[in-house]
C-alpha cells in the first residue's frame, strides 16, 4: 500500500517488515494471526525453526510458503511425532492467510532503520490508515512496537541505538492491538507489553496507550498504567474501566474540548483540568 503523505511536510520514508523478524525477535505469532491453539502454535514454532535453520537469516515469507508445500517434510514431521498432519495443515492455512505485501516488500527493512526511527529528541510516526485490512495494520504495528520493546528490555539488543535512547511508544487505537483474548497469540502479545509496562521505567521506556475503549485493553497491561488521562467518553463501561471517583466520572460524558481528568494513583488524587 502507498501512503499519500498529504497535508504535511515531514520527511517520509518507506519501509517493509522483513520476514526474518519472526526469527530475530522470536515472534511466531506475527504470522499466526488469531485462532491457533497451543498445539498448532507449537507446530508453527517448530516449522519456523526448521525453516530458518535451512534457509538462513534471510529466509523470506514466499520461501516459507514454498517450504510448507513440501509433502515429504509434512510426512517426516508427522511420523516423528513432532507435528501431526492435521496440525501441519492448520498452520499452513493460517500462514497463507497473511495479506500480501506485508512482508519483504520493495523498501528498506525496518530493522535497518533503527537510527532513523529512533533519534534523541526526534519524533517518528508510523501511519496505518492507508493499509487496506485490519490484519495488515496489526502486523505492522505489532512488528515495529515489539522490535522497540524487545531491544529495550533485552540484555543483548540487536540495536544499541534503541537500547540507549529514552523512548516513549505511543499506540493509537490500542484496544485493537492489546485486547484480551483466549488465544496463544494474544497471550504472547499481552505478555510482551505487560513486561514492557512493568520494566520499562528501568530501561527509560514509556508506553502511551490511546483508546476510546479502555475496557477492551487486556487487564495485565491496563493495570500497569501509572497515569490515566480521561477525555470525553460516552460509554458507561469505558468510564467505569478507568476507575475514577464517581463525582468525576459523572462529568466525563459532558466534557468539552480541552477538559480532562488526570489520575495517577501513585502520585496524587484525581484532578479535573
Put a short name on every predicted segment.
Residues 1-195, 202, 260-267:
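P-loop NTPase motor domains
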Residues 194-273:
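Conserved ATP-driven motor cores of ASCE-family P-loop NTPases powering translocation/secretion/packaging/pilus
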Amino acid at each position: 500500500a502507498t501512503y499519500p503523505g498529504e497535508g504535511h511536510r515531514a520527511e517520509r520514508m518507506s519501509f517493509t517488515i522483513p520476514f526474518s523478524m519472526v526469527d530475530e525477535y522470536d515472534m511466531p505469532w506475527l504470522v499466526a494471526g488469531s485462532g491457533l491453539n497451543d498445539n498448532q502454535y507449537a507446530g508453527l514454532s517448530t516449522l519456523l525453526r526448521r525453516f530458518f535453520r535451512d534457509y538462513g537469516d534471510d529466509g523470506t515469507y514466499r520461501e516459507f510458503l514454498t517450504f510448507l508445500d513440501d509433502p515429504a517434510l509434512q510426512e517426516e514431521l508427522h511420523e516423528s511425532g513432532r507435528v501431526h498432519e492435521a496440525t501441519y495443515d492448520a498452520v499452513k492455512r493460517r500462514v497463507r492467510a497473511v495479506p500480501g505485501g506485508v512482508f519483504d516488500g520493495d523498501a528498506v527493512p525496518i530493522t535497518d532503520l533503527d537510527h532513523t526511527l529512533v533519534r534523541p529528541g526526534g519524533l517518528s510516526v508510523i501511519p496505518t490508515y492507508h493499509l487496506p485490512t485490519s490484519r495488515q495494520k496489526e502486523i505492522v504495528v505489532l512488528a515495529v512496537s515489539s522490535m522497540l520493546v524487545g531491544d529495550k528490555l533485552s540484555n543483548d539488543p540487536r540495536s544499541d541505538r534503541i537500547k540507549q535512547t529514552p523512548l516513549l511508544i505511543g499506540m493509537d487505537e490500542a484496544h485493537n492491538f492489546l485486547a484480551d483474548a483466549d488465544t496463544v497469540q494474544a497471550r504472547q502479545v499481552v505478555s510482551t507489553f505487560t513486561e514492557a509496562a512493568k520494566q520499562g521505567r528501568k530501561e527509560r521506556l514509556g508506553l502511551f496507550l490511546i483508546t476510546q475503549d479502555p475496557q477492551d485493553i487486556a487487564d495485565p497491561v491496563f493495570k500497569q498504567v501509572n497515569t490515566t488521562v480521561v477525555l470525553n467518553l460516552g460509554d458507561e463501561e469505558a468510564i467505569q474501566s478507568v476507575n475514577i471517583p464517581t463525582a468525576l466520572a459523572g462529568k466525563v460524558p459532558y466534557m468539552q474540548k480541552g477538559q480532562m481528568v488526570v489520575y495517577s494513583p501513585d502520585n496524587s488524587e484525581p484532578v479535573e483540568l
